[in-house]
Amino acid sequence: MENIGRQRPIGVFDSGIGGLTNVRALMERLPMENIIYFGDTARVPYGTKSKATIENFSMQIVDFLLGHDVKAMVIACNTIAAVAGRKIRQKTGNMPVLDVISAGAKAALATTRNNKIGIIATNTTVNSNAYARAIHRDNPDTLVRTQAAPLLVPLVEEGWLEHEVTRLTVCEYLKPLLADGIDTLVLGCTHFPLLKPLIGREAHNVALVDSAITTAEETARVLAQEGLLDTGNNNPDYRFYVSDIPLKFRTIGERFLGRTMEQIEMVSLG
């Protein structure tokens, strides 16, 4: 019975497809784990919606994943983590629930040497102040500078990862953060890890914190601690569920995932 518990999947969810960067990191860090992903592509973006609506949509996704008997959940969406994280944890009880903000904040504090941390994220995540709160809970003396970088999302989805337009946009967003002397930068949006090489060149003396990688590390640590790591599965099952299959979804999704998406299924929630 214990082994069956370990074989249960990890549930990962996002408001769209950006969370596939988290799935990619989990596949690389935990190659024997079964994974179920849900992206609410019919109702993205969440950032423009009210707190009550975001909580309602999130609860529907959590119910869906609980119906698939997941052993842990990863909130692979900064907006959901900032707005509905507490409510999700109340609903799931003792189940391990990881999120990109908590993991990113923890990694940033472990990385910085001068106690000056920058965050680039979407408008909603910046306005929520969730990263600063998470960092200041552990170290109130840390300087946290946030910068909304909304234009990077469509550029990533367009595939312009090394385009001059993207480079210039990154430079503009980095200017105020670099002027404040940050030595650590959190990539606070699930799209941004794809721009890590470009951002690294433009902020070459700054350590980059990839929330997807740090969340995968934290997931591995918690599963091991709870005795839930699957160590005997050489043929893991990956399932991808979405609420809509928009134009170019597979192309963009596979760019985020770094491999082909074989099992995509559309489901309707709510």
Swiss-Prot record:
Gene3D superfamilies: 3.40.50.1860
GO terms of biological process kind: cell wall organization; peptidoglycan biosynthetic process; regulation of cell shape
Catalysed reaction, written as an equation: L-glutamate = D-glutamate
The enzyme's E.C. designation: 5.1.1.3
Keyword Transcription among UniProt keywords: no
Family: Belongs to the aspartate/glutamate racemases family.
Chain's role: Provides the (R)-glutamate required for cell wall biosynthesis.
Designated name of the protein: Glutamate racemase
Species annotation: Neisseria gonorrhoeae (strain ATCC 700825 / FA 1090)
